[in-house]
Amino acid sequence: MTMPQTDGVEFASRNNLENGDGDQVRSQWVAIERSPTCKRITTALFCKRDEQGKRSQRRVMDVSKLEDLDRRLFIDELIRHVEDDNRVLLQKIRTRTDEVGIDLPKIEVRFSDLFVEAECEVVHGKPIPTLWNAIASKLSRFTFSKQEDKISILKGVSGIIRPKRMTLLLGPPGCGKTTLLLALSGRLDPSLKTRGEVSYNGHLFSEFVPEKTSSYVSQNDLHIPELSVRETLDFSGCFQGAGSRLEMMKEISRREKLKGIVPDPDIDAYMKAASIEGSKTNLQTDYILKILGLTICADTRVGDASRPGISGGQKRRLTTGEMIVGPIKTLFMDEISNGLDSSTTFQILSCLQQFARLSEGTILVSLLQPAPETFELFDDLILMGEGKIIYHGPRDFICSFFEDCGFKCPQRKSVAEFLQEVISRKDQEQYWCHRDKPYCYVSIDSFIEKFKKSDLGLQLQDELSKTYDKSQTQKDGLCIRKYSLSNWDMFKACSRREFLLMKRNSFVYVFKSGLLIFIGSIAMTVYLRTGSTRDSLHANYLLGSLFFSLIKLLADGLPELTLTVSRIAVFCKQKELYFYPAWAYAIPSAILKIPISFLESFLWTMLTYYVIGYSPEAGRFIRQVLILFALHLSCISMFRAIGAVFRDFDVATTIGSISIVLLSVFGGFIVRKPSMPSWLEWGFWLSPLSYAEIGLTSNEFFAPMWRKMTSENRTLGEQVLDARGLNFGNQSYWNAFGALIGFTLFFNTVFALALTFLKTSQRSRVIVSHDKNTQSSEKDSKIASHSKNALPFEPLTFTFQDVQYFIETPQGKKLQLLSDVTGAFKPGVLTALMGVSGAGKTTLLDVLSGRKTRGDIKGQIEVGGYVKVQDTFSRVSGYCEQFDIHSPNLTVQESLKYSAWLRLPCNISSETKSAIVNEVLETIELEEIKDSLVGVPGISGVTAEQRKRLTIAVELVSNPSIIFMDEPTTGLDARAAAIVMRAVKNIAETGRTVVCTIHQPSIDIFEAFDELILMKNGGKIIYYGPLGQHSSKVIEYFMSIPGVPKLKENSNPATWILDITSKSSEDKLGVDLAHIYEESTLFKENKMVIEQTRCTSLGSERLILSSRYAQTSWEQFKACLWKQHLSYWRNPSYNLTRIIFMCFTCMLCGILFLQKAKEINNQQDLFNVFGSMFTVVLFSGINNCSTVIFCVATERNVFYRERFSRMYNPWAYSLAQVLVEIPYSLFQSIIYVIIVYPMVGYHWSVYKVFWSFYSIFCSLLIFNYFGMLLVVVTPNVHIAFTLRSSFYAIVNLFAGYVMPKPNIPRWWIWMYYLSPTSWVLNGLLTSQYGDMEKEILAFGEKKKVSAFLEDYFGYRYDSLALVAVVLIAFPILLASLFAFFIGKLNFQKK
């Protein structure tokens, strides 16, 4: 490879300092040399530049204090053309170190006889996690009946990854590539059984810290969505530190001073800036942004599924950049090219190759579909299959090895594709080269034996048998420190990030505070001047107001739980990388929430204190603020600890709800301490709410205004406290405050310990390939024979002219993403849509298909010669999205069956639909996994490439006339991509219109297309026309442009096209390819052809469908209910946890209120019974509402996809979602009756039992449906949870428990009637005691129970019929609102 040209790059050369400003540089350098070492290594001669690129005079500067603009402009000038100038930069750095005689540290990785095994559970039948299976699995832990087996992932692999060389890791999915990368980087899951030896420079993992010596780039993109790309890289670079750069810079500086060498000022400035540790921002970040092509989105937030952000390809590059921004030189990289075009992949790997060769790096990269040019960048190659290494040696010799085995790679065939297919039983025969000998399948074990006997194999075994020569020099590259920064620097960096995340989530905190002010305003007017009357009755109301304040602030901490769980995955990744210890993450999380806790406590007290009428002394006001502040702080600490311990949304939410129940029930208000069983009194002392209750009540009732003496020779305040069991003396306030601070410290300690010691949750399961070689029969996919079930369809032409698309930027400006795009997609023609990353390919597909939910679209789009009608178009088209969105709890076959059921016309029989489903399963080679659960990406279920094939299959079964496919081969290996594209080609040959965006096509895949639309950045077309035989037409077009380099023989034309049309190539040529196309004859011909196509299409009948949906409303509902039933039944984490929670709550109430309902002698007995009802209703409802939010939110993105495809009316979906909840709520209600009814001692009669069952059943439905409604009216679960907390506060306040109906001010009585809990509690209490005529002692006077209910609570027995109607009306209303809003609102931003 020739050295690149460096014209135009303004490097100051040491050998040329005499020219220009040489004397000035020397004199300035002398000043730097006189500085102390600590200052000299951060001081350089830096040339400032302005935004126009104009340079000022060089001056001595501290490079640790460079501004953002200085760093960006410096890197822009240093690296103008990435591939060329990066080599020059690294070469100059290497020359500088060589001149002073410094050897760069290097690492050789050896592994010998490495075995990795995983334990798996053996189940009978389908291993699908249903409710029964989950219960059986839990029970098997106690019965020891669980059967386990072992799966071998790696089977005795050995090899050497050498420095200065870049090694490619190839193999089919499931062969063990990821496990090998994890094993070599020291990141294997401890639960896996490992045998064998891995060493770095002869040192075992126990002698150093492998996580800090090597980097593993995961294939899962896991980032904090609120951070920008630059902030993500800066944070990673800060914690990875400078490694050996700092010491090396000191040594270079010392030796240069001794030799009198004046270094290149730019290189010196770069090296010194890159060696700075612990800085908030770093020049290395700008360098990584440049070489990865992320400069354009550097200040864009990463985003996620619910928040706009960077593209999938950019996210993939960010994952790579996050690992290589540090000083680590041993890199293990897992499928880093997913979602990237071949040109970008080539550019990134070229830079990595230069790094390996010039900086002594050791790099092992696994790729799925490397283009020939990318393939040739590698020095060595490891080919794997079935957990074994087939070949390990120089890349140049692998073809000759397989030729010796009898297999030859054809011309114009990518070697990487050949290697992955030649080891496959299905594809091997086509490469047999000994035509004079009969072909016989050569197994992987046979290949391995032949390699071991070859010269390369013998040489490898010989090297591995020799003991590595350890020396101190070779150990310099090994890191023995876990963390790169000091404790203080780690704390500061984590605090900076936490504060930034709080700023980015400021809307949530402001919104939460706004809701708190709203609820506080309601509460203060409900309890208006309650404290102005001093008697036992009003004291009871005042206690209710204090309890409500505590419950509100307790529930206000719940959003902290969801926030903790949502960030735990990123924390675990960074902890495993030894970015920082758990305490550095935990302490800022706790400390920075203190001001928020204080603010919310102060706001609440300021609103309510004097309006309600508490003791007016200023000191008591401050003490109430302090108690509420301490409670709020302890509660958010508790929820944070729960999130860290359990880490699963459903489980953590359920545990959070259980915690609220325990804290509330043992808090001293719902159940008085004297009324608790003696053996459960410890619960009172373990509840933070108890101490808050003690603190607030002692602060209030020991005030002067409550010192009125009663007949019992006690103050009124003491009498009130004694009645509640809260009289612990005046000094108890500070004891309570201290206890709450102690709880805060305890929960934060638990939080830190959980983060430190608990295993990473939700780690992806190990996927191993099935041994297809042992199958008795081979199922060969004969694509040509798949026409037996072909269905009639209408061939359609799709034309678009002068399409433009604009979006509005945050600054209020319009940004154009598509510019005058014109083209046509014709029946039977397979069209490729190509371009560099960010060119607008996906944007164009989204605009043409009508999927954009924002922005301004201009231009003409026609289907069949008529203006596109979206309802009709959605029915006749299919869209395979880039991101594979599916229901996680269906199997692969059920996903296809569901799609066929709803999208194929209703006149097609069920047998035909099933045949089509089976045919597509066979065509896309999904038959072997048809009974596998789809699962959640990266956590469970099918692999990424199987998920991609499922996405395509789901669209194929719908028999569309037009199919849009966005990156259908992304994430697939070469063989799987070929399978998919054969199926796609076959579809196009049936006369359908097929369009695919594609990033890294092989020669075979690329030339399977008939036409090509090529785009450049800015959404402009630079070529639209036929490919021609062997891509001759498109090659001829670009070769006609002066200066375009020729295509090398047997090279991939797709890679060549992307390379010559990149931005850097355009700049070199000095042309605008879009303008050249618009001025070309081809463009004029295309315009004529498009017009002719339109005119021809106009002669056909307009496509009119009889209905908006393929199926009747009844069929839609049946299909949706079938799917929802399966999804719920197979979701034990949702249903089992809420059932367990119901059992727990009922048992707790049964124990605490044991037989309390049998004897009612005074108002307190009635209050106890009412408390048990309140506890079950409110807290079981809270848990149901919380858990259903995650369940519905998981399916919402799937719903958006299915709704766009016009699979069903939203009413059919919502009705099924509503009805599927009923059996589970029914079961929970039965649990209540079975446990609570006999334990509490309610009256046994059919009427009363039914009323209890009916009231609880309606209550559960109300909370379930309200949770579902919250999901569809909010953009994400964090907002939903914040609104949910306010809903709890309102239904608690107006339930009639803390403030009975007769005492609610008339201006708020309408809220009482709107609160569902008030009707539920009315039904429960009135049905039990509304007809009781027994006299009791109530507040010093005798009253009948029925009269007391009417006077105190406002409950009348003769109103039960109205209560029954209202109770069923609430769930119907909420379900209707859910159905309405799910059809109207769409928070998916496209």
Swiss-Prot record:
Protein's cellular compartments: Membrane
Region feature Disordered, mapped onto this chain: 1-22
Entry's transmembrane regions: 507-527, 541-561, 594-614, 626-646, 651-671, 737-757, 1134-1154, 1173-1193, 1218-1238, 1253-1273, 1279-1299, 1307-1327, 1362-1382
Binding sites annotated in the UniProt record for ATP 2: 835-842
Domain ABC transmembrane type-2: 489-701, 1115-1329
ABC transporter domain mapped to chain residues: 137-411, 798-1043
A GO cellular-component term linked to this record: plasma membrane
Main location: membrane
One Pfam assignment: ABC2_membrane
Top-level taxon of the source organism: Eukaryota
CDD domains from the UniProt entry: ABCG_PDR_domain2
Keywords: ATP-binding, Membrane, Nucleotide-binding, Repeat, Transmembrane, Transmembrane helix, Transport
SUPFAM superfamilies membership: P-loop containing nucleoside triphosphate hydrolases
Residues noted as binding ATP 1 in the record, renumbered to the chain: 171-178
Membrane disposition: Multi-pass membrane protein
Record's keyword annotation contains Ribonucleoprotein: no
Entries under Gene3D superfamilies matching the protein: P-loop containing nucleotide triphosphate hydrolases (3.40.50.300)
GO molecular function list: ABC-type transporter activity; ATP binding; ATP hydrolysis activity
SMART domains reported for this sequence: AAA
PROSITE patterns in UniProt: ABC_TRANSPORTER_2
Role, per record: May be a general defense protein.
Family: Belongs to the ABC transporter superfamily. ABCG family. PDR (TC 3.A.1.205) subfamily.
Protein name (Swiss-Prot/TrEMBL): ABC transporter G family member 43
Source organism per UniProt: Arabidopsis thaliana
Encoding gene (name): ABCG43
